[in-house]
């Protein structure tokens, strides 16, 4: 009789423990070193989610960075960039939250003069990838679908050879681009700027410096608003500037 009572108690205790501490709760391993500086930690506007950065040394005496999100109690960790190597995560990153705290952009240096963006969507107190490929790669796909890329005599297959290829976030995501005079729906649009140069080309072709486009988080589509068209025309650079 007493044995049955003890057995039932043990089962109930086990169930309670599983409920309190769910199996599979993620956290950085002991082999990771957290970047302690405040500039490497980012908190959402609603204060419920934070991003921390960790350094992992590899067997080849190299290192890769991992980016983790946590809730306000520093529980329920989630890794933003699983399976990334030094090609995509060889440097610390910058992060920007949308004003409604539902979107997160990772601003990632790839090397000297190379930069891209990643977009994450929030579910509960965790973020996961919002696009099938880096947002920066999608922006280049869009650029190469535009007539301006054909004017430069560059084709889609040439994108990997572009010199100093960069995609950056235009300042204003945190205030919904009010500083640009926009009155867009809250946290729906993200403004990006693209650049590359012709350094090293024997006969330099036109390049772009600060060419802009807008990503719609609701539809997943890119566009160029009318008020950015003039800006983009001036963003095209020629070796002989008189041709502009």
Task: Describe the predicted segments one by one.
Residues 54, 107-108, 193-194:
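Recurrent small/Gly-Pro-centered beta-turn motifs in extracellular repeat architectures
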Residues 58-64, 110-115, 204-208:
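Short, solvent-exposed loop/turn segments at conserved positions within beta-propeller repeat blades
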Residues 9-20:
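Bacterial N-terminal signal peptides
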Residues 93-129:
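Extracellular-facing segments of soluble proteins and assemblies that are Gly/Ser/Thr-biased and enriched
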Residues 1-11:
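Bacterial N-terminal signal peptides that target proteins for export
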Residues 25-42, 112, 124-244:
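Acidic, small-residue rich beta-repeat scaffolds with periodic aromatic anchors
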Residues 37-100:
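Short N-terminal edge-element motif at the start of the domain
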């Amino acid at each position: 009789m007493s044995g049955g009572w003890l057995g039932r108690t043990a089962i109930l205790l086990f169930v309670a423990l599983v409920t309190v501490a769910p199996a599979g709760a993620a956290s950085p391993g002991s082999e990771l070193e957290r970047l302690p500086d405040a500039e490497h930690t980012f908190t959402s506007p609603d204060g419920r989610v934070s991003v921390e950065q960790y350094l992992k040394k590899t067997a080849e005496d190299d290192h890769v960075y991992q980016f983790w999100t946590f809730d306000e109690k520093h529980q329920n960790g989630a890794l933003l960039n699983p399976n990334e190597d030094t090609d995509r995560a060889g440097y610390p990153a910058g992060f920007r939250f949308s004003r409604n705290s539902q979107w997160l952009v990772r601003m990632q240096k790839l090397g000297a003069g190379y930069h891209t963006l990643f977009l994450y969507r929030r579910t509960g107190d965790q973020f996961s990838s919002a696009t099938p490929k880096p947002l920066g790669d999608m922006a280049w796909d869009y650029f190469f679908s535009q007539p301006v890329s054909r004017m430069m005599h560059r084709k889609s297959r040439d994108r990997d050879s572009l010199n100093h290829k960069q995609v950056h976030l235009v300042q204003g995501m945190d205030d919904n681009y009010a500083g640009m005079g926009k009155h867009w729906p809250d946290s729906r649009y993200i403004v990006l700027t693209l650049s590359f140069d012709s350094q090293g080309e024997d006969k330099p072709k036109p390049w772009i410096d600060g060419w802009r486009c807008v990503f719609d988080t609701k539809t997943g589509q890119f566009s160029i608003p009318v008020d950015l068209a003039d800006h983009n025309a001036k963003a095209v650079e020629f070796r002989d500037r008189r041709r502009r």
